[in-house]
Amino acid sequence: LITANIYVLCSDGDLQEGVSAESAALAGHLGLGNLIAIYDSNQITIAGDARLAMSENVGQRFEAYGWHVQHCNGHDHDQIVQAVEAARAEGGKPSLIIAKTTIGKGSPNKQGTSDIHGSPLGDEELAATREALGWEHSERFYVPEEVREVFANRKAENIEEYEHWQELFSQWQSAHPEKAKIWNQHWEPPYGEDQL
């Protein structure tokens, strides 16, 4: 019933934090094979170039924690899919996919710099980026109809999968009432909303 993978998207800045070492070491120790972290390795943080404060080999660090580590081009969807499939097949240990990217790819004057991290492009750079990427739409926050259709179809598939899972879960609860009681206790807060 509970066969889901847990996905993490993390950045250079995230992996500089001490808590990443503690949690990654524990995940490796416990062999959390359904945990897949995709590391957007663009060597940029909000404060500037990540190499100003980070020089370790992240892949080797995670291998030392007992993780399955892969590298891919973060701009190549096929490579990402292959890496995720390999991570799911690994099963016995958590996986780190180091996806090498260029932050702001396509922005002629800001890509690869911290100027694009958490900051708007501005009208001129936005126009230059649209041109560089061959994006013919000038509307802000525009989503083409074919993209909307893809998401609408996926939403329908997700609803169908969820309803099927709910049926299986209901059958499991009926067959295992004591375990179901424990399960439900974990999803109920130990206090009421009025106590928050």
Task: Tell where the protein language model's regions lie, with residue ranges.
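Glycine-rich ThDP/TPP pyrophosphate-binding loop and its adjacent helix/strand module
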Residues: L1-N153
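Thiamine diphosphate
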Residues: L1-N5, H71, R148-L196
